[in-house]
Amino acid sequence: MDSAYEYLHSKFNPLIGKYMRGSHFEQRCDGAAAIIVCPTELAYKYTDHPIEILGIGHSNVEAGNPRNEMYATQNAYRQVKELTGLTGADMDIFLANDFYNQSEFLSAEMCEYLPKGEGWQYTKEGRIAYDGDRPINTNGGRCQYGHAAGAS
């Protein structure tokens, strides 16, 4: 194949539904993840631009009902909002735990990073790209780098 566009419409990327193809879903893979958390003062010894964690939200769901993912996202966002006083409008970047590509902008809408019902338009216009005004999953998300279960 000569281009990525050619691959997108090839037999290697089958149509799953009317608008979705195989590559639009997370891919299972082997891997691991790590994060180093330390006091801000110590972080400056290693970088001029440390990432400061202002708040964390967490929610578990029963996996048998796919709609539960929506409630988990909303609950975790509510926790962060209460802890920090910040909203999605205050964020510079949004990283979504995506199981399929469309869940990126749906999660961003739930967390007030994008206006409700307009995520598809932001996506279509390229505004959620790494160089857009509302970037989402600049690392590619799990649909691109894979899902090493438990490491995301």
Task: List where the protein language model places each region.
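Hydrophobic alpha-helical bundle architecture
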Residues: 85-94, 137-146
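Generic secondary-structure signature for well-ordered alpha-helical cores
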Residues: 41-44, 82-85, 109-113
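Condensing-enzyme catalytic core mediating Claisen C-C bond formation in acyl metabolism
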Residues: 14-79, 125-139, 143-144
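Conserved active-site "lid/cap" helical segment
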Residues: 1, 19, 76-92, 103
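Short, conserved beta-strand edge motifs with alternating hydrophobic and charged residues
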Residues: 53-54, 93-97
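Short, catalytically relevant binding-site loops at active-site mouths
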Residues: 59-60, 73, 87, 98-102
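Short glycine/threonine-rich loop-to-helix capping motif typified by GTGT followed
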Residues: 65-69, 98-121, 150
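Glycine-rich, mobile lid/loop segments that gate access to catalytic sites or pores
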Residues: 1-20
